[in-house]
Amino acid sequence: MTTKKFTPTITRGPRLTPGEISLTPPDDLGIDIPPSGVQKILPYVMGGAMLGMIAIMVAGGTRQLSPYMLMMPLMMIVMMVGGLAGSTGGGGKKVPEINADRKEYLRYLAGLRTRVTSSATSQVAFFSYHAPHPEDLLSIVGTQRQWSRPANADFYAATRIGIGDQPAVDRLLKPAVGGELAAASAAPQPFLEPVSHMWVVKFLRTHGLIHDCPKLLQLRTFPTIAIGGDLAGAAGLMTAMICHLAVFHPPDLLQIRVLTEEPDDPDWSWLKWLPHVQHQTETDAAGSTRLIFTRQEGLSDLAARGPHAPDSLPGGPYVVVVDLTGGKAGFPPDGRAGVTVITLGNHRGSAYRIRVHEDGTADDRLPNQSFRQVTSVTDRMSPQQASRIARKLAGWSITGTILDKTSRVQKKVATDWHQLVGAQSVEEITPSRWRMYTDTDRDRLKIPFGHELKTGNVMYLDIKEGAEFGAGPHGMLIGTTGSGKSEFLRTLILSLVAMTHPDQVNLLLTDFKGGSTFLGMEKLPHTAAVVTNMAEEAELVSRMGEVLTGELDRRQSILRQAGMKVGAAGALSGVAEYEKYRERGADLPPLPTLFVVVDEFAELLQSHPDFIGLFDRICRVGRSLRVHLLLATQSLQTGGVRIDKLEPNLTYRIALRTTSSHESKAVIGTPEAQYITNKESGVGFLRVGMEDPVKFSTFYISGPYMPPAAGVETNGEAGGPGQQTTRQAARIHRFTAAPVLEEAPTP
């Protein structure tokens, strides 16, 4: 099976910061003190005295009464009311004071509500990113989020099961006595202000849980898991869980094995496409052996492991066993290290059980506990949806190899150059073949230049930056005289311009050994200039530094103007953002990538040492401005040139034959380039980042061109004329879950 190499990118995503909020309780109303005996009798005594005084005044005659005497009963009434008011309450707060405290406390809760609401929104966004809806998984395949969970990630071996209630990460802490809400003075609940107490209880119940939050199940916690209940719902949940695992975990860190009685069951046959179900080394006639078994013997190697430990990481990939037999995997209750068995069905012996209901909810059960609701909406995915995801993932692998078993054609060690760029003949390579790639197209700036000698695979140099899944943006090439360096550069440039429109890439070619490398390329519409060290172009060499500096400044100015034109807050961050606005319809002119190729840059730096500063600037800012640099030389020892400042930004290295092991190690980290023989012109090693060097052979395009005859395939060995070979008939095997046996070749 042919696969493309996929290098996982660790993505951080939204951040979640747990916190704690110490909730201030409502005020204490105080304890009512019962009145004393005197306080109880006093109102009656004062009432009797007032009545006696009125009786005396009436008996003595009203005419003899002074007006001031009439005020005395009124004064006594006022004194009695005041005494009653002062004697009641028993030390508690007055009503106006209680109302004021209540308003202040409700304002306090309103302020907290703003914080916890923002925290809840962040929590839902965090889990929505790391646990996207099953319908969004297909769009993640092929992006930098695919296989982005390393073994040390928090959610390594975790999968989404649905949405439901989650405890808020911003925990609400309440002061309590005996489990009840209490005031700061530890007064129990009955003595709290009742209205404020009611609101704080509602606040805790409302904001203590986050509703409709995506939920992840950490498989490493449990050795065995059973998913039962409604059969269709359980199967849909298991399908969604497996697809989530396959999209976010690379096959070298998570392996999926399947135990089933029907390997070609249409509801589960899609599993065979997952890279995680492919054996890393064993093959059959259809490619990698599928880890789909009908008997327990396929799991026998796992039984030799130690008991399951939730906190330990396996030495190899974590193994998820999908048991479709209802529990016949036969794993012991304590499980096995680095293994989780997920059984479809109500398997009572599992450590963790999920029971899916027809209404879409689900309950779960931990050991020695009863069932409780775990999701309000349980995930569900159809076999058709899963098949689309699995088939799309099948095109990727960690190594990007082509297995020998899948091909019954004679391996092509070298192919004519025009065939590699998609043409049947050189005559077909015309401007009509130029492509306008979208900015996110993986094939943009991906240049074929030869074949890997070990496998015969086509070799590409992807000069896009690493964030765009490329090997660039800057690199270095070394090769001594006769190594095929000039041939490599010509092949690289012609392959690029044969497939890419001039509006997407321009060239600035510099040759400091007389101009023979890029001879004739000044006629290409992609070429901005060809600069050599010929005497008549000496002034142009001196001006090249000014031209490149001006180009960097021009691109920065264009990004500032474009930012104002599209209404951005400031200058656009780079050409990538510029292209996004263009693809959305913004009226912006094309801003093609500038590919600067400098042959014999060591000679250039010896004559113009000030160029080292310019190259350093290109390496630093060229990434966002899309000015890509390739520095080529015969030797790093010419004139004592040192490029220490540039090396950290040179992300790909190419070494053809070198004169010493020191130069080979300086470029690709190994001495292998020194051992390339004189007869292997065009053979070299490509190293990208910290990966191992890959040996390749470039095309030979400087020889005479002969159109291929009908029915005959022309192979052009690097450094030699073409050879004619006929293609053998290919054998096609049906890709099944079960092993495909080898067939004897027919004479």
Swiss-Prot record:
Binding positions (ATP): G479, T480, T481, G482, S483, G484, K485, S486
Protein name as it appears in the record: ESX-1 secretion system protein EccCa1
Matching InterPro entries: EccCa-like_Actinobacteria, FtsK/SpoIIIE/SftA, FtsK_dom, P-loop_NTPase
Activity control note: EsxB binding to the second FtsK domain of EccCb1 causes multimerization; a subsequent unknown step relieves the allosteric inhibition of linker 2 on FtsK domain 1 (this subunit), activating the ATPase activity.
Domain FtsK: 456-665
GO biological process: biological process involved in interaction with host; protein secretion by the type VII secretion system; symbiont-mediated evasion of host immune response
ATP-binding is among the record's keywords: yes
Role of this protein: Part of the ESX-1 specialized secretion system, which delivers several virulence factors to host cells during infection, including the key virulence factors EsxA (ESAT-6) and EsxB (CFP-10).
Miscellaneous comment as given in the Swiss-Prot or TrEMBL entry: In ESX-1 cluster, the FtsK/SpoIIIE-like protein is split in two genes.
Organism domain of life: Bacteria
Segments passing through the bilayer: 41-61, 65-85, 222-242
Cellular component terms per the entry's GO annotation: peptidoglycan-based cell wall; plasma membrane
Chief subcellular location: membrane
